[in-house]
Amino acid sequence: LSGMDENAASLARKWGLGLELTDFCEARKLEEPAAMEAARARCSGIGSLWLHAPFAELSPCAIDPRVREVVMLRFRQTVQAALALGIRRIVVHSGYIPLVYFPEWFTARSVEFWREFLRDAPDGLCLALENVMEPEPDMLVQIAAGVDDPRFGLCLDVGHANTRVSETPPLDWIAPMAPWLRHVHLHNNDGDWDLHDALGQGMIPMPDILAALAEQCPAADYTIENQNCELSLRWLCARGYLEEP
């Protein structure tokens, strides 16, 4: 369950599920001791954990080398924070912005960035690169193939794949990403804005998505990304995916 729901931690404990920590989505909190203590308390008693890295203004493909230095610093701080909390799985946004970065630049510079980043990263780390504003999965697939490191994979955000910036239906993202897919963000929308609606509220054919993921990416795990995750938990229970606690 995503920490974007303020009740996610208590729901995770109640339902026996994991938590994707969002406490450090704002990069400044990486340097605030109080934020670390709050995150530690939130994680208490939860066995399966992911950490969502900060993302605003952090593009690994940044054109300005000084900006790239800041991105490298913030993601290294993210790894340090995760390890301090006993977390080894981290979701990172790709940083792609349409009409700002040419796809060729974005993929080449991203591969370069992540190879450099992973030189100093510990064994056993898992980074999952998430789609946000990409029109199709090919750029992320090229990055994962180019980085070619067992610590580096992909995160399919099903909701982002159904917004106005995506030119590819969500179902068609799965097969290309499958060899590298480590994690999935689940939420629904109306095909336009990134609403993060409950799984049953929107036009994404969620049963078809879940069936395709189970068949093609059985090792991937999932985060429900809603501001009210309980609605999606009830939807999953009603269809036999989960049992109520």
Predicted regions and their residues:
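Charged helix-capping and loop-helix junction motifs
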Residues: 33-38, 67-76, 104-114, 166-175, ...
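Acidic-and-aromatic substrate-binding clefts and catalytic sites of carbohydrate-active enzymes
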Residues: 1-9, 22-37, 59-62, 98-102, ...
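Alpha-helix-loop-beta-strand connector modules within alpha/beta enzyme cores
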Residues: 39-56, 110-124, 206-213
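Histidine-acidic metal/acid-base catalytic patches
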Residues: 7-13, 88, 137-152, 156, ...
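Active-site acidic/histidine proton-transfer and metal-coordination neighborhood
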Residues: 61-153
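Helix C-cap/helix->beta junction micro-motif
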Residues: 15, 44-47, 85, 121-123, ...
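N-terminal pre-domain/capping segments
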Residues: 1-77, 243-245
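Hydrophobic faces of well-ordered beta-strands that scaffold small-molecule active sites
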Residues: 1, 17-21, 49-53, 90-92, ...
